[in-house]
C-alpha cells in the first residue's frame, strides 16, 4: 500500500521524480514477499501510459523504466497465477489490465529489449485474460513478423517461441466450439498469423526458418493447421517467388523450396501429414474452376461453398494463371511428398504402413473424388485453351493416386479397396476397381492368406455386376463392365486353385447373357469374356451351367447385325464359345448343330464385311480348328450331316466355312477312325456331290466355287485312303455319275473331281485312270460341235457347261499324261484318245474367244504332253499327221491353232521330231502362202522356232 502511495505521489515534472520511480521499481522487482500485489496494477499501467507520452528531451530515455514496469507487471501476474491460468475477478479485474498499452509498448519502442519484455508479458497475460489479448493479437504478430523474426540471436528466437507458446494456446482455447462463428473467427485469425510467418520467411535467417514454422504449427495443432501452412507456402511460391526468380533459376528454386516443404511436413507424424493432404484436396475441390466464375459469384453474394470456405488463397486477388499454377503445384507436391525419402523414412520409423489403417482409405477416397472433379472439369473445358492444363492436372492427380496405392501393403490394400468398392460415388467405385485390376495384373506370387482376402471380394463385385445399387444407368454400365473384368482377372489368377468361389460368378454371367435380359452391349461383351475365363478354369464344375449357357450363347450369335456392328462384342462371343468347346468337348453334343450353324454363318458375314486378317476371322478360324480337332468323329460327323441339310438350303458363301471344318477333321482322323466311318462319309459325300445337279440352273461360277469346297474336302479323305479302300469308292463315284438315269450335270462334278484327285495322287492315279479313257474319248466327241449338232446338256446354258466339261477333261488328261511313269498310254489307249483330242482343234464351241482360250490353255498343252506320254515314234507319226491335216481346215482360226500345236509337239519331242519333219514340210510350205496373213506370219515364226528347237536350218526346204 505504502509503495502504491509512493509511486502515485511522484510528481510529473522533473527528472528526479523518474529517478525515484526507477528506484522504487527496482526495489519492487527484487521484493519477494508482496501482499496483494494486484493493488499496484492500476498504478503501474498509469506510469506506463506516462512513459509512452512524448517527453521533453531532458527527461532522457525512458526505455529502462518501461522495461522495469513491464517486468514488475510480469512478476505480479506470475505471483497471482503461478500456473498461468485465469485470475478471479475479485482479485484482479480484467478492466484494470490495459493490454492495449503493452501492445503499444511493443509498437512504439525501438529497443529490442523492451519488445522482449512486452512480448513475454503478453504471453503470460494471454493465459490470464485471453479475450483481452485476442483483440490485439494481429498487432503483436504483425510486429513480430516485421521485426523480431529478422533478428538472428538466441534471445530473439526464444522470445518468438515464448510468444507463440503463450499467446496461441490462449487463442485456440477461446474456440470452445460453442458456435460456428467463433470457430470460423479463430480459424481466420490463425490463417492471418500463419500468413505473417510465411510472409516474413524470406527475411528470417535460413537456419531459423524450420524451427520457427515447426514451433508455430506444433502450437496451433498440426492436425488442424499444417495444411493451411502448406497452402500459404504454395501461394507464396506462385505469387512472389516465381516473379522474383531470374529466368532459368525457377527449377532450382522450386526444387529447394520443395525440399524445405518436405522438411516441414516430415517434422510431424505421418497421420498428420496424410490428414493435411486430405484437407488440401478438399480445399482444392472448393476452389472455382476459373477466375471468371468468382466475379459473377461476388455479384451474386458468392456461392454457399465459397461462403463456407476458409479464405486462404484469395482467388479475387490472383490471376487465372496463378490459380492454375497453385492447383498444379499443390497436387504435384503431394505426389512428390508421398514418394519422397523423408516421408517413406517417417513411415518406416513410425512402424510401417500398418499405422495408416483407416487413414489411407479416406485418402484414397479423397484422391478419387478429386480425380473425378478434375475429369469433369476437363470435359467441360474440352474446347477451351485451358484443356491442356486440365489434362496435365488430371495426369498429376493419377500420379498421386499411384503413389497412394504404392504405400498400401496388399494386406491393407484389399480391405481399403473393399471399402471403396462399396462407396456411394460411382466414379470412386470405378477407380477402386481399376486399382484392383492393376494390382491383379502384376506378375506376383501371392501368399495364401492374401489370396483368401482377394477371394472375399467376389461377393462385393457380384453385387456391382447385379446392379444392386440405385445409380445412373450409364455410370453403372461401365462399373459393371469393370467389375466383370475384375472377376475375370481374379479367376485367371486364383480360380485353378480355388474354383468354388467362381461357381456363382459363372452363374451370374450366364444370367446376364440371357437374351430376355436385353443387357447393354458392353456389359454383355464383358460377361461373355468372364464366361470364357471361368468356364476354362472351372472345367467340370461348369457343366451344370451348360443348359442355360449354350442356348443364350447361340441366341447371342444369331443376332449377327449386333455382332458385326461391334467387333469387341463379336470377339467376346467367339472367345466364350471357343473356351466352352475347348474345355468341355464331351458335353456339347446337344448343341453342336447350333454351334456349327452359327460359326459358319458368322464366317460368311465377317468375310463379307472385313478382311481375312481381321481379329474376328482369326478367332473364327481358331474356333473351327478347335471344333474339327477336339471332337470325336462319332460326335461331329452326325452333326455335320444334319447341319449340311440346313446349309444346303442357304448355300451361298456357307459351304466353304462348313466344308473346311470337315476337311480339317478328316485331316486329324486316325486310320482306324477313318476306316470305321468311311461308309458314313461316302454316303455324305455322294449326297453333297449332287449339289451341282440340284442347282443346275444357278450361276455356273458360283456353283463351281461351292462344288470345289466339297471336292477339296473329299480329296482330303482320298489322300488318306489306301489303294484297297479307295478303289471301291472310286467305282462308286464312277457309277454314281454314269448310271443311265443320272443327271448329266453329275459328269461335270465327276470330271472336276477326277481332275482334283489326279492332281493330288499324281502317278498313283494312273492305277484307276484306265477306266476313264473311253468315257473321256466319248465325251470329247459328244461335245465337239464340228461332229454333232445335239446339245449335251438339256439346259439353256449348254455351251457354257460343255466348255466347262471340256476344261475338266483336258486338265485331267494333261495331269494323267504329266505324272505317268508306268507307261499308261498303251497303243490302244493312244488310239482311243488321239482323234477325239486332235478333233478338238476344230471344236469352236463357246465362240471364238472361248475357243482360242481353250486351245491355248488346255488343248495344246494336253496334246503335247500326250505325245510325251506315248513315248513311241510309231504313234507320233499318226498324231503329227492328224494335226497337220487340221492345217488345211477351211477356218483360219483352226489352221492357226494346228500350227501352234505342231510347234508345241516339236518343243516337247525335241530332236525326236526330226523323223516327223519330212512329213510336216509340205504342210508348212502351204501355210507359208496362206491367204490369211496372220496364219502366214505365224508360219514363218513357227519355222524360225523349229530351227531353234531342232538346231537345223530349215529355210532351204521352202
UniProtKB/Swiss-Prot annotation:
Phosphoserine: residues bearing it: 4, 305
Chief localization: nucleus
UniProt key word Transcription regulation: yes
One GO-annotated biological process of the protein: protein localization to nucleolus
Transmembrane segments: none
Subcellular location: Nucleus, Nucleolus
HEAT repeat extents: 920-956
Keywords: Nucleus, Phosphoprotein, Ribonucleoprotein, Ribosome biogenesis, rRNA processing, Transcription, Transcription regulation
Assembly with partners or alone: Part of the small subunit (SSU) processome, composed of more than 70 proteins and the RNA chaperone small nucleolar RNA (snoRNA) U3. Interacts with MYC; the interaction is required for localization of MYC to the nucleolus.
Protein name: HEAT repeat-containing protein 1
Organism: Macaca fascicularis (Crab-eating macaque)
Gene for this chain: HEATR1
Amino acid at each position: 500500500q505504502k509503495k502504491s502511495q509512493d509511486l502515485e505521489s511522484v510528481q510529473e515534472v522533473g527528472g528526479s521524480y523518474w529517478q525515484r520511480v526507477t528506484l522504487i521499481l527496482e526495489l519492487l522487482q527484487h521484493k519477494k514477499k508482496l501482499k496483494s500485489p494486484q493493488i499496484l496494477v492500476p498504478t503501474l499501467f498509469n506510469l506506463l501510459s506516462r512513459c509512452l507520452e512524448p517527453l521533453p528531451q531532458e527527461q532522457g530515455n525512458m526505455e529502462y523504466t518501461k522495461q522495469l514496469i513491464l517486468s514488475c507487471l510480469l512478476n505480479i501476474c506470475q505471483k497471482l497465477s503461478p500456473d498461468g491460468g485465469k485470475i478471479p475477478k475479485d482479485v484482479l479485474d480484467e478492466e484494470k489490465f490495459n493490454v492495449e498499452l503493452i501492445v503499444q509498448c511493443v509498437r512504439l519502442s525501438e529497443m529490442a529489449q523492451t519488445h522482449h519484455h512486452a512480448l513475454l508479458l503478453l504471453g503470460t497475460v494471454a493465459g490470464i485474460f485471453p479475450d483481452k489479448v485476442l483483440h490485439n493479437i494481429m498487432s503483436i504478430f504483425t510486429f513480430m513478423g516485421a521485426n523480431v523474426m529478422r533478428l538472428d540471436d538466441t534471445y530473439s528466437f526464444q522470445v518468438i517461441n515464448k510468444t507463440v507458446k503463450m499467446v496461441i494456446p490462449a487463442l485456440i482455447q477461446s474456440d470452445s466450439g460453442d458456435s460456428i462463428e467463433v470457430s470460423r473467427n479463430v480459424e481466420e485469425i490463425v490463417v492471418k498469423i500463419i500468413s505473417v510467418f510465411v510472409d516474413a520467411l524470406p527475411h528470417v535467417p535460413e537456419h531459423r526458418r524450420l524451427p520457427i514454422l515447426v514451433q508455430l504449427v506444433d502450437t496451433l495443432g498440426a492436425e488442424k493447421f499444417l495444411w493451411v501452412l502448406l497452402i500459404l507456402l504454395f501461394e507464396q511460391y506462385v505469387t512472389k517467388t516465381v516473379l522474383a526468380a531470374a529466368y532459368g533459376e525457377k527449377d532450382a528454386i522450386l526444387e529447394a523450396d520443395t525440399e524445405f516443404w518436405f522438411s516441414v511436413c516430415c517434422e510431424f507424424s505421418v497421420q498428420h501429414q496424410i490428414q493435411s493432404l486430405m484437407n488440401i484436396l478438399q480445399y482444392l475441390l472448393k476452389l472455382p474452376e476459373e477466375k471468371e466464375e468468382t466475379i459473377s459469384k461476388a455479384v451474386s453474394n458468392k456461392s454457399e461453398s465459397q461462403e463456407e470456405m476458409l479464405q486462404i488463397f484469395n482467388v479475387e486477388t490472383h490471376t487465372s494463371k496463378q490459380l492454375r499454377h497453385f492447383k498444379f503445384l499443390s497436387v504435384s507436391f503431394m505426389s512428390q511428398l508421398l514418394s519422397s525419402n523423408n516421408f517413406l523414412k517417417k513411415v518406416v520409423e513410425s512402424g510401417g504402413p500398418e499405422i495408416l489403417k483407416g487413414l489411407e482409405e479416406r485418402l484414397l477416397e479423397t484422391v478419387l473424388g478429386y480425380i473425378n472433379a478434375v475429369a469433369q472439369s476437363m470435359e467441360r473445358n474440352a474446347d477451351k485453351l485451358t484443356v491442356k492444363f486440365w489434362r496435365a492436372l488430371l495426369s498429376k492427380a493419377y500420379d498421386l493416386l499411384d503413389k497412394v496405392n504404392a504405400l498400401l501393403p496388399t494386406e491393407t490394400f484389399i480391405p481399403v479397396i473393399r471399402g471403396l468398392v462399396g462407396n456411394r460415388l460411382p466414379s470412386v467405385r470405378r477407380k477402386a476397381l481399376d486399382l484392383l485390376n492393376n494390382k491383379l495384373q502384376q506378375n506376383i506370387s501371392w501368399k495364401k492368406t492374401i489370396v483368401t482376402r482377394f477371394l472375399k471380394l467376389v461377393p462385393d463385385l457380384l453385387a456391382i455386376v447385379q446392379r444392386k445399387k440405385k445409380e445412373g444407368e450409364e455410370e453403372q454400365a461401365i462399373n459393371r463392365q469393370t467389375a466383370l473384368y475384375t472377376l475375370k482377372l481374379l479367376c485367371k489368377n486364383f480360380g485353378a486353385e480355388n474354383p468354388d468361389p467362381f461357381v456363382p460368378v459363372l452363374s451370374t454371367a450366364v444370367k446376364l447373357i440371357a437374351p430376355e435380359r436385353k443387357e447393354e452391349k458392353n456389359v454383355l461383351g464383358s460377361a461373355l469374356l468372364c464366361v470364357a475365363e471361368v468356364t476354362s478354369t472351372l472345367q467340370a464344375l461348369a457343366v451344370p451351367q451348360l443348359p442355360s449357357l449354350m442356348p443364350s450363347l447361340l441366341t447371342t450369335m444369331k443376332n449377327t447385325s449386333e455382332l458385326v456392328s461391334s467387333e469387341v462384342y463379336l470377339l467376346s462371343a467367339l472367345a466364350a464359345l471357343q473356351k466352352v468347346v475347348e474345355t468341355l468337348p464331351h458335353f456339347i453334343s446337344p448343341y453342336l448343330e447350333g454351334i456349327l450353324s452359327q460359326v459358319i454363318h458368322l464366317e460368311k458375314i465377317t468375310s463379307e464385311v472385313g478382311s481375312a486378317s481381321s481379329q474376328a476371322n482369326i478367332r473364327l478360324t481358331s474356333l473351327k480348328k478347335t471344333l474339327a480337332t477336339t471332337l470325336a468323329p462319332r460326335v461331329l460327323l452326325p452333326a455335320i450331316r444334319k447341319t449340311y441339310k440346313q446349309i444346303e438350303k442357304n448355300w451361298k458363301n456357307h459351304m466353304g466355312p462348313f466344308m473346311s471344318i470337315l476337311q480339317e477333321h478328316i485331316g486329324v482322323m486316325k486310320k482306324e477312325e477313318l476306316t470305321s466311318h468311311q461308309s458314313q462319309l461316302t454316303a455324305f459325300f455322294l449326297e453333297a456331290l449332287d449339289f451341282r445337279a440340284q442347282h443346275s440352273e444357278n450361276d455356273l461360277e458360283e456353283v463351281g466355287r461351292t462344288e470345289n469346297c466339297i471336292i477339296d474336302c473329299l480329296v482330303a479323305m482320298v489322300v488318306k485312303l489306301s489303294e484297297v479302300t479307295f478303289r471301291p469308292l472310286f467305282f462308286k463315284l464312277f457309277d454314281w455319275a454314269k448310271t443311265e438315269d443320272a443327271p448329266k450335270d453329275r459328269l461335270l462334278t465327276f470330271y472336276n473331281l477326277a481332275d482334283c484327285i489326279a492332281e493330288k495322287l499324281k502317278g498313283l492315279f494312273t492305277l484307276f485312270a484306265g477306266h476313264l479313257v473311253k468315257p473321256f474319248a466319248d465325251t470329247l466327241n459328244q461335245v465337239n460341235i464340228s461332229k454333232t449338232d445335239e446339245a449335251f446338256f438339256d439346259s439353256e446354258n449348254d455351251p457354257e457347261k460343255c466348255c466347262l466339261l471340256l476344261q475338266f477333261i483336258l486338265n485331267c488328261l494333261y495331269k494323267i499324261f504329266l505324272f505317268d511313269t508306268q507307261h499308261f498310254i498303251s497303243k490302244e489307249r493312244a488310239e482311243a484318245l488321239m482323234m477325239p483330242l486332235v478333233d478338238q482343234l476344230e471344236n469352236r464351241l463357246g465362240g471364238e474367244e472361248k475357243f482360242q482360250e481353250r486351245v491355248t490353255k488346255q488343248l495344246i498343252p494336253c496334246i503335247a504332253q500326250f505325245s510325251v506320254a506315248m513315248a513311241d515314234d510309231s504313234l507320233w507319226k499318226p498324231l503329227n499327221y492328224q494335226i497337220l491335216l487340221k492345217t488345211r481346215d477351211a477356218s483360219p482360226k483352226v489352221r492357226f491353232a494346228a500350227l501352234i500345236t505342231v510347234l508345241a509337239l516339236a518343243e516337247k519331242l525335241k530332236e525326236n521330231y526330226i523323223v516327223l519333219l519330212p512329213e510336216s514340210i509340205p504342210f508348212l510350205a502351204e501355210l507359208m502362202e496362206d491367204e490369211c496373213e496372220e496364219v502366214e506370219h505365224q508360219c514363218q515364226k513357227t519355222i524360225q522356232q523349229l530351227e531353234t528347237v531342232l538346231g537345223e536350218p530349215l529355210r532351204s526346204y521352202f
